Amino acid sequence: MKFTEALQFIKDFEIEGDLLEIGSDRGDGSTYIFATLAKNLDRKLFSVDVDNDVIDHNREEFDKLPFSLPVEFFNQTGEDFLDENKDLKFSIVLLDNFDWDWNPQSADPDPSIVAQQVKYREQFNLEMTNHQSQFTHLRQAMRLTDMLTDEAMIVCDDTYWAQEYGTYTGKCGAVIPYLEILGFSVVLNKDHGIVLVRKK
């Protein structure tokens, strides 16, 4: 999804917390977009990724900028970061880690997905399956429960409404109902991305 489209939903927000991105930029511009937003809001972006190569690349790209942005990178799982930083509060969260395999039964799988599955298994001891993706995102959402400000926005990438089944699926397919229990409402469902908002 185009992450800039989510920004329209915070115009009337009382931003009391920082920004969190679990799953740093892999070419979609998310970290730069949310770091710029953090600067405009006089807040800070915490960008978390388990892959040290991704973290190193993003640090290098941000170091090249002729100006500074309020972003701090963390090379760990989202769950570990949240467990170690329970004192933080977030008003804007992007959940976009643990990639989704759009065609897991294919006889000719995407080489990039296969390479990532091998890397995650060998380096991080993680089985990169769609079930594990939903499981991981739900665990992160549950840990975030007490770390979210009253007014908050959560962006779920690679997640969509499956009309034929009448339910959400993708990375955050299990997260959406949980967030609705917490008072969030879906305000955007577009291009395999979901935006949820909770207002006072």
Question: Where in this protein do the model-derived segments appear?
Answer:
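A short alpha-helical cap/connector motif
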Residues: M1-K200
